[in-house]
Protein backbone atom coordinates (compact mmCIF):
# COMPACT_ATOMS: atom_id res chain seq x y z
CA UNK A 1 0.00 0.00 0.00
CA UNK A 2 1.32 3.42 -0.87
CA UNK A 3 0.32 6.61 0.86
CA UNK A 4 1.38 10.20 0.80
CA UNK A 5 0.05 10.81 4.33
CA UNK A 6 2.37 12.13 7.01
CA UNK A 7 1.73 11.00 10.58
CA UNK A 8 2.97 13.07 13.50
CA UNK A 9 3.74 11.24 16.73
CA UNK A 10 4.18 13.20 19.93
CA UNK A 11 6.76 11.15 21.79
CA UNK A 12 9.69 9.31 20.32
CA UNK A 13 10.17 6.58 22.90
CA UNK A 14 9.94 2.84 22.27
CA UNK A 15 6.18 2.98 21.69
CA UNK A 16 6.60 5.92 19.32
CA UNK A 17 9.28 3.97 17.48
CA UNK A 18 7.02 0.92 17.14
CA UNK A 19 4.16 3.11 15.91
CA UNK A 20 6.50 4.73 13.38
CA UNK A 21 7.77 1.37 12.12
CA UNK A 22 4.19 0.18 11.57
CA UNK A 23 3.19 3.41 9.82
CA UNK A 24 6.26 3.35 7.56
CA UNK A 25 5.59 -0.30 6.72
CA UNK A 26 2.11 0.79 5.57
CA UNK A 27 3.64 3.45 3.33
CA UNK A 28 3.29 6.54 5.50
CA UNK A 29 5.88 9.17 6.34
CA UNK A 30 6.42 9.82 10.08
CA UNK A 31 7.64 12.85 12.00
CA UNK A 32 7.99 12.55 15.78
CA UNK A 33 8.33 15.25 18.42
CA UNK A 34 10.62 14.40 21.33
CA UNK A 35 12.99 16.32 23.62
CA UNK A 36 15.81 13.84 22.90
CA UNK A 37 17.46 13.93 19.47
CA UNK A 38 18.59 10.33 19.93
CA UNK A 39 15.21 8.96 21.05
CA UNK A 40 14.29 5.47 19.77
CA UNK A 41 11.99 6.87 17.04
CA UNK A 42 14.93 8.84 15.60
CA UNK A 43 16.22 5.58 14.16
CA UNK A 44 13.25 5.35 11.79
CA UNK A 45 11.61 8.79 11.57
CA UNK A 46 12.37 12.47 11.26
CA UNK A 47 12.49 14.14 14.70
CA UNK A 48 11.51 17.60 15.84
CA UNK A 49 13.60 18.10 18.98
CA UNK A 50 11.57 20.05 21.53
CA UNK A 51 9.78 19.59 24.86
CA UNK A 52 6.29 18.07 24.66
CA UNK A 53 4.75 21.34 25.90
CA UNK A 54 6.47 23.56 23.30
CA UNK A 55 3.46 25.04 21.48
CA UNK A 56 5.60 26.33 18.59
CA UNK A 57 7.02 22.83 18.05
CA UNK A 58 3.52 21.31 18.29
CA UNK A 59 2.35 23.85 15.72
CA UNK A 60 5.26 22.96 13.41
CA UNK A 61 4.39 19.27 13.75
CA UNK A 62 0.69 19.93 13.09
CA UNK A 63 1.47 22.04 10.01
CA UNK A 64 3.66 19.31 8.52
CA UNK A 65 1.39 16.35 9.24
CA UNK A 66 -1.97 15.11 8.01
CA UNK A 67 -2.82 13.39 11.29
CA UNK A 68 -1.39 13.43 14.82
CA UNK A 69 -1.26 10.97 17.65
CA UNK A 70 0.64 10.64 20.91
CA UNK A 71 2.45 7.75 22.55
CA UNK A 72 1.72 8.58 26.18
CA UNK A 73 -0.44 10.86 28.28
CA UNK A 74 2.10 13.45 29.45
CA UNK A 75 1.33 15.71 26.48
CA UNK A 76 0.15 19.33 26.61
CA UNK A 77 -3.58 18.98 25.83
CA UNK A 78 -4.10 22.75 25.77
CA UNK A 79 -1.19 23.12 23.37
CA UNK A 80 -2.65 20.45 21.11
CA UNK A 81 -6.06 22.12 21.14
CA UNK A 82 -4.40 25.39 20.14
CA UNK A 83 -2.67 23.99 17.05
CA UNK A 84 -4.68 21.10 15.61
CA UNK A 85 -6.96 21.41 12.63
CA UNK A 86 -10.43 19.82 12.61
CA UNK A 87 -10.06 16.03 12.46
CA UNK A 88 -6.27 16.11 12.65
CA UNK A 89 -6.24 14.44 16.08
CA UNK A 90 -9.00 11.82 15.65
CA UNK A 91 -8.96 10.74 19.29
CA UNK A 92 -9.25 14.36 20.46
CA UNK A 93 -8.00 15.61 23.80
CA UNK A 94 -10.93 14.80 26.13
CA UNK A 95 -9.66 11.31 26.97
CA UNK A 96 -6.09 12.63 27.06
CA UNK A 97 -7.11 15.06 29.80
CA UNK A 98 -8.80 12.27 31.76
CA UNK A 99 -5.78 9.97 31.44
CA UNK A 100 -3.43 12.70 32.70
CA UNK A 101 -4.89 12.48 36.21
CA UNK A 102 -5.18 9.07 37.86
CA UNK A 103 -8.04 10.27 40.07
CA UNK A 104 -10.06 11.48 37.07
CA UNK A 105 -9.14 8.30 35.21
CA UNK A 106 -10.33 5.94 37.98
CA UNK A 107 -13.53 7.96 38.39
CA UNK A 108 -14.21 7.93 34.65
CA UNK A 109 -13.53 4.20 34.29
CA UNK A 110 -15.56 3.10 37.30
CA UNK A 111 -18.45 5.60 37.21
CA UNK A 112 -18.85 6.60 33.56
CA UNK A 113 -17.50 3.61 31.61
CA UNK A 114 -18.72 1.08 34.22
CA UNK A 115 -15.37 -0.73 34.24
CA UNK A 116 -14.41 -2.70 37.34
CA UNK A 117 -11.22 -1.23 38.79
CA UNK A 118 -9.04 -2.39 41.66
CA UNK A 119 -9.95 -0.89 45.03
CA UNK A 120 -8.33 2.49 45.58
CA UNK A 121 -8.36 5.46 47.90
CA UNK A 122 -7.64 9.06 46.97
CA UNK A 123 -4.77 10.37 49.10
CA UNK A 124 -4.33 14.13 49.21
CA UNK A 125 -1.81 14.36 52.06
CA UNK A 126 0.26 12.22 54.41
CA UNK A 127 -2.57 12.45 56.95
CA UNK A 128 -4.60 10.16 54.68
CA UNK A 129 -1.95 7.46 55.20
CA UNK A 130 -2.01 7.60 59.00
CA UNK A 131 -4.34 4.64 59.51
CA UNK A 132 -3.33 2.20 56.80
CA UNK A 133 -2.99 -1.47 57.71
CA UNK A 134 0.64 -2.47 57.10
CA UNK A 135 -0.33 -6.15 56.99
CA UNK A 136 -1.60 -5.33 53.48
CA UNK A 137 0.37 -4.08 50.50
CA UNK A 138 -0.27 -0.69 48.92
CA UNK A 139 1.03 1.28 45.98
CA UNK A 140 0.92 5.04 46.41
CA UNK A 141 0.88 6.83 43.06
CA UNK A 142 0.99 10.51 42.22
CA UNK A 143 -2.20 11.72 40.55
CA UNK A 144 -0.26 13.34 37.71
CA UNK A 145 3.07 13.07 35.97
CA UNK A 146 4.02 9.53 36.89
CA UNK A 147 5.28 7.04 34.31
CA UNK A 148 7.31 3.83 34.15
CA UNK A 149 7.38 3.51 37.94
CA UNK A 150 8.20 7.17 38.59
CA UNK A 151 5.82 8.83 41.04
CA UNK A 152 5.07 5.55 42.82
CA UNK A 153 5.92 4.07 46.17
CA UNK A 154 5.18 0.48 47.20
CA UNK A 155 4.31 0.37 50.90
CA UNK A 156 5.15 -2.83 52.80
CA UNK A 157 6.63 -1.48 56.03
CA UNK A 158 6.89 1.45 58.39
CA UNK A 159 10.08 2.58 56.59
CA UNK A 160 8.21 2.55 53.26
CA UNK A 161 5.43 4.51 54.88
CA UNK A 162 7.86 7.24 55.95
CA UNK A 163 8.99 7.62 52.33
CA UNK A 164 5.36 7.59 51.18
CA UNK A 165 4.55 10.54 53.46
CA UNK A 166 6.92 12.73 51.44
CA UNK A 167 5.35 11.60 48.16
CA UNK A 168 1.83 12.17 49.50
CA UNK A 169 2.69 15.71 50.55
CA UNK A 170 4.39 16.61 47.26
Model-based region annotation:
Residues 70, 89-91, 119-122, 140:
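General beta-strand structural signal in soluble alpha/beta enzymes
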Residues 93-100, 121-128, 145:
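Short, glycine/charge-rich beta-strand/loop segments that flank catalytic centers
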Residues 88, 109-115, 141-149:
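Acidic/polar active-site rim loop that often engages polyanionic ligands
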Residues 55-59, 63, 81, 126-130, ...:
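Amphipathic, non-transmembrane alpha-helical secondary structure
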Residues 47-52, 121-125, 154-156:
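Short acidic-hydrophobic, aromatic-tinged amphipathic segments that line or gate anion-handling sites
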Residues 1-100, 104-107:
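ATP-binding N-terminal substructure of ATP-dependent carboxylate-amine bond-forming enzymes
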Residues 103-137:
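Anion-binding (especially nucleotide phosphate/pyrophosphate-binding) glycine-rich loop
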Residues 115-118, 138-140, 153-170:
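Conserved ATP-binding module of the ATP-grasp superfamily
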Amino acid sequence: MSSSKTIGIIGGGQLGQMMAISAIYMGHKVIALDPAADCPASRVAEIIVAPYNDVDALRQLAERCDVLTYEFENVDADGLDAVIKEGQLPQGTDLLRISQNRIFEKDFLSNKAQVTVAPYKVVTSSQDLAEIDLSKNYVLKTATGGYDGHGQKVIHSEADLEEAYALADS
